[in-house]
UniProtKB/Swiss-Prot annotation:
Signal peptide: none annotated. It is found in: Cytoplasm. InterPro entries: ATPase_NBD, Bacterial_glucokinase, Glucokinase. It comes from the Bacteria. It is an enzyme of class 2 (transferase). It catalyses: D-glucose + ATP = D-glucose 6-phosphate + ADP + H(+). NCBIfam families: glk, PRK00292.1-2, PRK00292.1-3, PRK12408.1. One of its GO terms (molecular function) is D-glucose binding. This is Glucokinase. It comes from Hahella chejuensis (strain KCTC 2396). Its main location: cytoplasm. ATP binds at residues 10-15. Pfam families: Glucokinase.
């Protein structure tokens, strides 16, 4: 009996490696499994362990997303011990095709295949068919990418947009900038719009108000804000959403993202209702004479758990991803 033809897709983070199989000409993820990276010496051990549980699948193609730079001949994970030469790894695994993409590039490509029920709309009209899309997401850092339609496919834009300068707009934000500038020298928006950035913002607001910080983890700040049990934590989360709105609006203007904005990452989906009620949308649109332009752009919060795997499946078949 012949085996079924599948491709292997992966989303490799610092802690976990997520794997799935996709059938030819399909984007449906099958046999999703999450493996702890620390349980394996390197990628090939994890892949072999995963495939050993699916002997019915014949796999000759693979695409994987990595939470680290992927240009060059060597993959060196930022937050775990895995490191390998690309050509050697492909030979060891015996794949005819093996594509490597950055994790946020995969996230951007994955938004093309997220089901409608996993998209939470936050204002705006309808996205323009074929127009550029912005994909942005606070998580461990601030990922910024885009999707531009070509003659054949959607081309992902790899950017370092999370490292643009933080531009304060009122006295409180100016004070935050001064405090963070003393600590970091240059202050990018990522110093505020990520997990550690939320903590930076909280500590700055505590310093402005002359109180000792009560929380030491970003999750503690979020929990206290949502429970309305800490005034400064609540103020922190509100300001986080407002600053994120301005930064997202700037990025949408730069890209011309009339196709819509897709908010990914692990932070915003944890408090969608708070986010929806925050000043995010107002600050997103607050661009003077460009207000109407931004007012029509829809913003979607992506709640799909495996967007990166969907993106790896897209990248494997996408002619714009090499």
């Amino acid at each position: 009996m012949s085996k079924a033809q599948y491709a292997l897709v992966g989303d490799i983070g610092g802690t976990n490696a997520r794997f799935a199989l996709v059938a030819r000409d399909s984007f449906e993820l099958e046999h999703i499994q999450v493996l702890p990276c620390n349980d394996y010496a390197n990628l090939d051990e994890a892949v072999r362990d995963y495939l050993a549980h699916h002997p019915e699948a014949e796999v000759h193609e693979a695409c994987m997303a990595f939470a680290c730079p992927v240009h060059g001949d060597t993959i060196k994970m930022t937050n775990n011990h895995w490191t390998f030469n690309k050509a050697d790894m492909q030979a060891r695994l015996g794949f005819d095709t093996f594509k490597y993409v950055n994790d946020f590039t995969a996230m951007a490509l994955g938004t093309l295949h997220v089901a409608d029920e996993r998209l939470q709309k936050v204002g705006g009209g309808e996205g323009k068919d074929g127009a550029a899309r912005l994909v942005i997401g606070p998580g461990t850092g601030l990922g910024v990418s885009g999707l531009v339609r070509t003659m054949t496919d959607w081309a992902p834009l790899s950017t370092e947009g999370g490292h643009v300068d933080f531009a304060p707009t009122d006295e409180v934000e100016i004070s935050v900038l001064r405090i963070l500038k003393e600590r970091f020298g240059r202050v990018s928006v990522e110093r505020i719009l990520c997990g550690e950035g939320l903590l930076n913002l909280y500590r700055s607001l505590c310093e402005i108000d002359g109180v000792e910080p009560a929380h030491t983890q970003p999750s503690q700040v979020t929990e206290a804000a949502l429970a309305n049990s800490d005034v400064i934590a609540h103020k922190t989360l509100k300001l986080f959403c407002a600053i994120f709105g301005r930064v997202t609006g700037n990025a949408a203007l730069t890209l011309g993202a009339l196709g819509g904005v897709y908010v990914c990452g692990g932070i915003i989906p944890r408090f969608i209702e708070f986010f929806r009620d925050s000043d995010f949308r107002q600050c997103f649109e607050d661009k003077g004479r460009m207000r109407d332009y931004l007012g029509g752009i829809p913003v979607y919060v992506v709640t799909e758990t495996y967007t990166g795997l969907l993106g790896a499946a897209e990248a494997l078949k996408n002619q714009e991803v090499h």
